């Protein structure tokens, strides 16, 4: 014997009882009596109607067995060496004081700035040297030669 469950109230529907409602998207709703069918059609929320199973579950009514909470295993992060950095180096870097870390960072930034400045100066000097050897500047159009106008042909 197949016992169905009311889509609205959650009550049991025994064979030969209840009605079916098939929505346009072919979803089937079963109702135990006209009361739950009517409330469903009025678009009432079963969690707000005191006698439904959903309300009772939602508001923790009735006898409920104490379900032992499932203990989730906490993941522990394991530190592993990365390519180019050994485990000791990583631990050493992590244990550095913020002031020391800040000083190191500023030192590196200063060094990078100096390096960029030197590169820029070298590039500028090279550009000045190459500009001195060049005689006069030509545009691409001048280099190609003057545009030749095609003579118009007539019939």
Swiss-Prot record:
Region: Disordered, residue numbers: 66-155
CDD domains listed in its UniProt record: Ribosomal_L24e_L24
Localisation: Cytoplasm
Highest taxon listed in the record's lineage: Eukaryota
GO BP terms, alphabetized: cytoplasmic translation; translational elongation; translational initiation
Keyword match Phosphoprotein: yes
Cited Gene3D superfamilies: 6.10.250.1270, Ribosomal protein L24e (2.30.170.20)
Main localisation: cytoplasm
InterPro entries attached to this UniProt entry: L24e/L24_sf (IPR038630), Ribosomal_eL24 (IPR056366), Ribosomal_eL24-rel_N (IPR000988), Ribosomal_eL24_CS (IPR023442)
Chain positions found as Phosphoserine: 7
Function (record text): Component of the ribosome, a large ribonucleoprotein complex responsible for the synthesis of proteins in the cell. The small ribosomal subunit (SSU) binds messenger RNAs (mRNAs) and translates the encoded message by selecting cognate aminoacyl-transfer RNA (tRNA) molecules. The large subunit (LSU) contains the ribosomal catalytic site termed the peptidyl transferase center (PTC), which catalyzes the formation of peptide bonds, thereby polymerizing the amino acids delivered by tRNAs into a polypeptide chain.
Protein name per its UniProtKB record: Large ribosomal subunit protein eL24A
Gene transcribed to yield this protein: RPL24A
């Amino acid at each position: 014997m197949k016992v169905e469950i009311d889509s609205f109230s959650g009550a049991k529907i025994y064979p030969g009882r209840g009605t079916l409602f098939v929505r346009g998207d072919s979803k089937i709703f079963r109702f135990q009596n006209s009361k739950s069918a009517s409330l469903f059609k009025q678009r009432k929320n079963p969690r707000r109607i005191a006698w439904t199973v959903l309300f009772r579950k939602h508001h923790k009514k009735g006898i409920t067995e104490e379900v032992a909470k499932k203990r989730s295993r906490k993941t522990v992060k394991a530190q592993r060496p990365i390519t180019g950095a050994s485990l000791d180096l990583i631990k050493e870097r992590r244990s550095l004081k913020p002031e020391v870390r800040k000083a190191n960072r500023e030192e590196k930034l200063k060094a990078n700035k100096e390096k960029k400045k030197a590169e820029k100066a070298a590039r500028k000097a090279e550009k000045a040297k190459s500009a001195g050897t060049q005689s006069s500047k030509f545009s691409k159009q001048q280099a190609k030669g003057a545009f030749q106008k095609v003579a118009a042909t007539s019939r």
